Amino acid sequence: MSTYFISDIHGCYEEFRILLEKSSFNDKKDYLWIAGDLVSRGPDSLEVVKYLYSLKDRVQIVLGNHDINLIAVHAGIKDNKKENYFDEFLSSPDSVELINWLRCQSFLKVDEKRKIIMSHAGISPQWDINIAKVCALEIEDRLSHKNYALFLKEIYHNNIDFWRLDLNQLDRLRYSMNSFTRMRYCYPDGRLNMFCKKSPDFVKYPLRPWFLMPSSISKVYSIFFGHWSSLKGTHVPKPFFPLDAGCCWGEELVMLRWEDGKWFSQAYLSKKCI
């Protein structure tokens, strides 16, 4: 039994399945942890989600910003843009069932025995592990609720970038969503920056990568995340594991087997990725 970590598949189904074959992933005994952004930009979002749905308890998923966008588009809250490649998914007779399954996925996975954490963008350096767990549960509860569309209408907000215990309920949810699915950089006081996507090679003070900020969590846990293809594995100290290698941008999909630390990769093949 092995555990594999991957992120940002982005509808690149062909590359994903080849990578699973390369790694000898066994869907009867192995486990797959995916750090979000299953869909969008690549041509086969529907096939990716259908396959993961078929794995049932063999897959552990945290949602990324593009997964949330798909749910919002399906609910009629956001426009279906051409670059999403969502048409096939939205027209599928399975779309409602698959969307409902996605809505019940997590924003944070924690394995206390192995001291492993996974989220899409990362973990706010302003949180300790207990606050992070509570905040994840709060947004998971809203997204899985029957009135999830109302939640999604209110959740997008760029100005909620600083954590305080006295945040009102809605702003608390907004901050949590920004932290788990959107942040890359922080300011020295801990405020999140959701806009800069560049490699740290090209970014100067006052911005710092979130994983270089002081944090009680990284002293205890190995942290797996995606969302940031321009990192290219550089500038990232242990115990952080960046998983987004930019497959949908014409680069590669990567996967780590936890037990022996072996990395697997598959170069971009799809012709419709953007």
UniProtKB/Swiss-Prot annotation:
<dbReference type="InterPro" id="IPR004617">
    <property type="entry name" value="ApaH"/>
</dbReference>
<protein>
    <recommendedName>
        <fullName>Bis(5'-nucleosyl)-tetraphosphatase, symmetrical</fullName>
        <ecNumber>3.6.1.41</ecNumber>
    </recommendedName>
</protein>
<dbReference type="GO" id="GO:0008803">
    <property type="term" value="F:bis(5'-nucleosyl)-tetraphosphatase (symmetrical) activity"/>
</dbReference>
<dbReference type="Pfam" id="PF00149">
    <property type="entry name" value="Metallophos"/>
</dbReference>
<comment type="function">
    <text>Hydrolyzes diadenosine 5',5'''-P1,P4-tetraphosphate to yield ADP.</text>
</comment>
<dbReference type="InterPro" id="IPR004843">
    <property type="entry name" value="Calcineurin-like_PHP_ApaH"/>
</dbReference>
<keyword id="KW-0378">Hydrolase</keyword>
<dbReference type="InterPro" id="IPR029052">
    <property type="entry name" value="Metallo-depent_PP-like"/>
</dbReference>
<comment type="similarity">
    <text>Belongs to the Ap4A hydrolase family.</text>
</comment>
